[in-house]
Amino acid sequence: MSALLSAALLVGLPAAHAQTAPPTPAAPSTPAESAPPAAPSAVPTAPTLTLAQTLTLVRASPGWRSADLQYRSAQLSLDSARARAGLNVTVGGDASLVKVPLASGDWLSNATLTAQISASVLPWSATFEGVRIAERALNRAGADLRDARVSLVVQAVRAYGAAREATAGAALAEAQVALAARQLEVARAQRAANLIPELALQEREGALQSAQNAAAQARTSVALAARGLANLLGQSVTLPSTAAAFDAVPPAPAAPADVDALVTRALLARPEVIRAAAQLADAGAQQRAAQLDLSLPDLSAGVQYGQLGSGTGSAGRTVGGNLNVKSGVAAAQISFPLRDPGETAKTGLALSLNASLPVFGSGKGTALTSANVSQQAAALALESARQSVDLDVRQKSADLLTALDRVEEATSALARAQASLTSTRARLEAGLVTPLDVTQAELSAAQAQNALNAATANAYVSSLLLAQASTELDPTLVNPAF
């Protein structure tokens, strides 16, 4: 079987290389003449693409960079929200020029410098809530970033395996064409000797045509696999010319662990659940804000000390502060006139308290009702997300079990093909079959081995998908020995 595999890969070399590297003109030649030109074409300038290189390239792909940028945007939004929640300093000034009475009075000028410092001090302040919203958004972005990276890694592993499988399939298809051509030559000789009917010869011709069509489709599959890998990586790639040049297929994974434990883990870290939980928290914050807006009066208290102005004079140097209970913002002010107010300004203390409470027609009750409905909808969305995650993990676990069953089936099929090959070789030694029958048995065994490789690779990808669904997969720890 190893001899046939080597022959199949050599036969498939020109076809696979034509799909993964720039085409080179070649004149028709006999099989014996086609071997020498293979040496220079088998020395490409680009290195053989390995899975480790693929995983390195995917970290520079557009999808990876886009996920990084989205997370960075969430970080900047949080920094901006925290900056808005800090101290705010405002400096201003005003100037006036007054003449009273207009006909006989003197021009009096005055200029005042003012400064104000304000900050949010109560927990329900809008700026504090903005920080909490930005923190939840960053948490969502972090979960989305991790999921995007894991998804890209799994896609890269799957695309690399698909390219390997397509290349192996193309080589086997070319080997099938060569075998069908030899069988047709024998059939023509038998027909010339009138040993078989014309219908048998036509069947051989049809078999060759079918093999050629299958080989063409296999070459197209190689091209599509290379294109899909290039689209994922965001750059052109050169695939290995033969399946043997790819990284080896990994061993079959173990059966999934306790599904309930995987579901429990997924419910804590899946981005869908984190996103829905954050939306519920946002809806709860809106509901609390609407409740406070309805129940708290618009209350503000202030104090001012310094050279307070009388009814006929201007104020002098003053300091003061105020607190708005509803907005949760406290502020301190200082006023410094550039002109001495004189005797009219006396040192004193002023206290103020303002309050207003809407009684009818404010619409705040409607806003609270709407916020309650939004909170209930968000709670339902969270429950739906949790159920979806539960179902997804259990489905991925079932898919892995199915893939492992197919590995066992492919292993049994390979054992049967190898037993048939051994029997056919023994029958050849006894003179009961022809060498073409042995070649057909060797090709069948090679196809069974390729089917086992494909089933094993599919089981490996299924295990990665389950690990992704249960949030156990770390994109930095994926085994590159594929």
Predicted region positions:
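Gram-negative bacterial Sec-dependent N-terminal signal peptides
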Residues: 1-17
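Bacterial Sec-pathway N-terminal export signals of envelope proteins
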Residues: 16-90, 120-121, 237, 243-286, ...
